[in-house]
Amino acid sequence: MAASSSELEVITAKKPNVKGPRRVANQIPEEILKDSDLNEAIKALPANYNFEIHKTIWRVRQAKAKRVALQLPEGLQMFACVIADIIERFTEADTLVMGDVTYGACCVDDFTARALGADFMVHYGHSCLIPIDSTEGIKMLYVFVDIQIDTAHFLDTLRFNFPPGRSLALVSTIQFVAALQAASAALKPDYEVLVPQCRPLSPGEILGCTSPRLDKHVNAVIYLGDGRFHLESIMIANPDTPAYRYDPYSKVFSREYYDHDAMRATRLKAIESACSAQRWGLILGTLGRQGNPKILEHLESQLKSLGRSFTRVLLSEIFPRKLELLADVDAQQWRYSRLDGRMCIPWISIPIRVWGPGLLIIRITNLNGLHAKPHRRLVSR
């Protein structure tokens, strides 16, 4: 028999205790953003360079840091003392500027920073390649240093040189990624625009050691930036795609070329020159976090399987005269174990033969990979 309505009791079910993702407030306090003294001090830095000073001050205060280590690439070191003065003035921390050469985010040297007593580190000008949770014992902040450019001139230049409907791949360094995204959005109504991505890098960002492979239908790759180091990376990865460079400083647009045949011939010659070598030198890079022990161990196992002996050396940078002192390495065959795919192009300007990991793998297996992408990932961390 069904219960009468007077005997029914309505029970409200409890909401399940499901915790959502933890949210951390990332809003910079108004008292920092509107600090007139701080804003006046920031004017000592170039207006078109975003050093994220407000965020830095907030993060240093939030962490209650006592000593802040600043790491900048050579092109930004001229601003280091100004930034250090601002941090010391508006926080309770003192600062130190790290003097070792910094080629990229793989050079993040949290080990040295900790040894110098720093409990907070700011790395400028590069992507977050080393995760902030990997730097144990020290707080980490990456500042990309976004640089504002004349985007209108860049767009006018591309529209003048390429007819509508063309397929264009846009790439740059991290400093110009924001400008690249703005340009991509403006060009899409008239062009097929591709902003390629190589994770964990940002869309459109390339490194001297890492670039994406593009589809064959891409008519041209446009590099926004100065110099050729990063540009050559994507040219090596895409030998059949015409490459152009727009220099945002000089506003010069140029067609760029790379001698792929000479590069491959050099690689083949280096491989053949080592066929009779019995003892090899393996260098583990100690500049920041460039050296990869897993790659080193992998190469050692490969050499052992071939019955080759080796000498292991730790170096922050390669100095040919120092390597010449180690005469027990046959034919001076050295392998530099670091995260730099460009080392797959052997050095020919010095008497010592220095190889990258990719080229050594080819040498100790077979010649089939001669034309392979020179900066492919061989061994993960």
Curated annotation (Swiss-Prot):
- Taxonomy, superkingdom: Eukaryota
Cofactor(s) listed: [4Fe-4S] cluster
GO: which molecular function terms?
2-(3-amino-3-carboxypropyl)histidine synthase activity; 4 iron, 4 sulfur cluster binding; metal ion binding
Record keywords, A-Z: Cytoplasm, Iron, Iron-sulfur, Metal-binding, Nucleus, S-adenosyl-L-methionine, Transferase
Q: In which pathway does it act?
A: Protein modification; peptidyl-diphthamide biosynthesis
Q: Name one GO cellular component term.
A: cytoplasm
Task: Output the Gene3D superfamilies linked to this UniProt entry.
Answer: Diphthamide synthesis DPH1/DPH2 domain 1, Diphthamide synthesis DPH1/DPH2 domain 2, Diphthamide synthesis DPH1/DPH2 domain 3
Record field: catalytic activity: L-histidyl-[translation elongation factor 2] + S-adenosyl-L-methionine = 2-[(3S)-amino-3-carboxypropyl]-L-histidyl-[translation elongation factor 2] + S-methyl-5'-thioadenosine + H(+)
Q: Where in the cell is it found?
A: Nucleus; Cytoplasm
Checking Pfam families in the record gives: Diphthamide_syn (PF01866)
Q: What is its EC number?
A: 2.5.1.108
Quote the cofactor binding remark.
Binds 1 [4Fe-4S] cluster per subunit. The cluster is coordinated with 3 cysteines and an exchangeable S-adenosyl-L-methionine.
Binding residues for [4Fe-4S] cluster, per the UniProt record? Answer: C106, C209, C344
Tell me one GO biological process term.
Answer: protein histidyl modification to diphthamide
Chief location bin: nucleus
Cite the record's note on assembly.
Answer: Component of the 2-(3-amino-3-carboxypropyl)histidine synthase complex composed of dph1, dph2, dph3 and a NADH-dependent reductase.
Role: Catalyzes the first step of diphthamide biosynthesis, a post-translational modification of histidine which occurs in elongation factor 2. Dph1 and dph2 transfer a 3-amino-3-carboxypropyl (ACP) group from S-adenosyl-L-methionine (SAM) to a histidine residue, the reaction is assisted by a reduction system comprising dph3 and a NADH-dependent reductase.
Name the family. Answer: Belongs to the DPH1/DPH2 family. DPH1 subfamily.
Q: What is this protein called?
A: 2-(3-amino-3-carboxypropyl)histidine synthase subunit 1
**Gene source species:** Danio rerio (Zebrafish)
